[in-house]
């Protein structure tokens, strides 16, 4: 049975692939994605890498988001304690766990990973900013000393920057790291990568959980297919088992297929745009406020997402643990947006905006067109720049980009 997963909360999206022949024999699970991996280092990967890496690597703890209590469950750590002041955390590590390269997982490996990740100033390295020291107390005991209280149990469960990987990485060339050869402990191992085409993972025979169940796959193929129509056809024809980012408008068509299941889950994802605060004209706070006031979230949810989302009440999704709504969210109001333009001190001719968006998503395209229309109504000149996620991700990290 093929699966289509919809994330009800202005979903971002994941992946699926196509093009060459697929040996769909029951032992191969085929996923379709809209773009490729850009960083194979588990220390700094911060984008679509999460799909293959969540099968290749594991954290110390997992956060169970299936219920409202958001329980922490054991990963590579079996138990943990913290001091009353929240500054000292002790983790008991799982025994008899090996990395894909044969290295033994232990406290020294944890220390190596955290120390290495902290040394970078990119990706999710910031999650370790409150960790002052990591001590390997014993083979399977590790202590984290913080400089101020932080929810370290949540931090070590992060989907970015918290994967445990082999200390043998220190002896690897940068080229080997860049090609996906850093070993993890996960159920699947890296096998091959054809850039912009396919990633293949194979079963880890030494996986610590074992493979006693009969319902598993020998191979995972993650294929890159930029066109949503092609991803849809792959699901319909049985060439793909799992797909994300199928346009909402086509879901009813898929629901009629006996071999396809369409499921909906609340997501910890908000749909938002990044504004460059270092470059004209979005370095002007009143221009930024005008853009925010011209963003019609209700209309976008209703007509673009078919009410599959909820209007966000802040930058962070409201269903994340300990969420508190900020009081600074600007409501949609075109008249107020025009007033912000006047307060900016700039004429309409001085305000030219480029909007980059992911062209492989029909929802992103329609959202951007809605924004384009509203910006025109308040006198802002806008140029649309569609492109692949990987290209837009690089733009988002470039100070020269405006939006």
Identify the function of each model-found stretch.
Residues 31, 102, 376-403:
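Periplasmic binding protein-like
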Residues 32-84, 115, 181-183:
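N-terminal lobe/hinge region of extracytoplasmic solute-binding protein
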Residues 22, 92, 126-170, 192-194:
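Surface-exposed binding/hinge segments that line
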Residues 78-123, 137, 143, 234, ...:
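Aromatic- and charge-enriched surface segment that lines or borders ligand/interaction sites
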Residues 203, 263, 283-373, 377-378, ...:
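Append "and occasionally in soluble cytosolic enzymes with long acidic Gly/Pro-rich linkers
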Residues 64-67, 158-215, 219-221, 227-229, ...:
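Gly/Pro-rich hinge or "lid" segments in bacterial periplasmic/extracellular proteins
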Residues 35-51, 76, 103, 149, ...:
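A structural "hinge/loop" feature
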Residues 206-253, 381-383:
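Ligand-site clamp/hinge motif
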